[in-house]
Regions:
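Ribokinase/PfkB-type carbohydrate-kinase core domain
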Residues: 1-10, 71-85, 95-148
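Glycine-rich phosphate/adenosyl-contacting loop at the front of the ribokinase-like
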Residues: 1-59, 64-68, 74-78
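Short, basic and Ser/Thr-rich N-terminal targeting/leader segments
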Residues: 50, 88-91
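Short beta->alpha linker loops
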Residues: 60-61, 89, 140
């Protein structure tokens, strides 16, 4: 079976939802969840669950959060052979929701993906071109999106 390549984000998603009406500019009691996410990561896990061979091309840091991404992918049978380990922190998304679950604000720091440069992507382009399918998420730089 040919491999499906996913190029883009693998991140840590941190979400919070208050128990009651959210009070702005104040601390609110509620629930906070931390889990592995990112567009490309999430799609890769779903495809692997359908028993496709999946390769995630991303960039992650070297700390605790990177370990969470690696463990998530390993458990899901998602290959990280072409994922870069970088000095920066792993991409992070923070979402704050209201008591009904509607988003109040989201902040995304996916700057680690700046390491997926056209030069790096050119080194794995033969594998990508030979794949059954390549899915690219919109978190890459414009230059990398144009290259692919």
């Amino acid at each position: 079976m040919q491999t499906i390549y996913l190029v883009g984000g693998a991140a840590i998603d941190i979400t919070g939802k208050p128990e009651n009406v959210c009070r702005e500019r104040d601390s609110n009691l509620g629930k906070v969840q931390i889990r592995v996410g990112g567009v490309a990561h999430n799609i890769a896990k779903r495809l692997a669950a359908l028993e496709y061979d999946v390769e995630l091309v991303s960039a992650i840091g070297s700390g605790f959060h990177a370990g969470m991404v690696r463990e998530s992918c390993q458990k899901a049978n998602v290959s990280l052979q072409h994922t870069l380990a970088c000095a920066e922190h792993t991409g992070t998304y923070i979402g704050v929701y209201d008591e009904d679950g509607d988003m109040l604000v989201g902040i995304s720091d996916m700057s680690v993906l700046d390491n997926l440069t056209p030069d790096y992507l050119s080194s794995i382009l033969p594998q990508i071109n030979a794949s059954a399918l390549c899915v690219i998420d919109g978190n890459l730089t414009p230059a990398s999106l144009d290259y692919l």
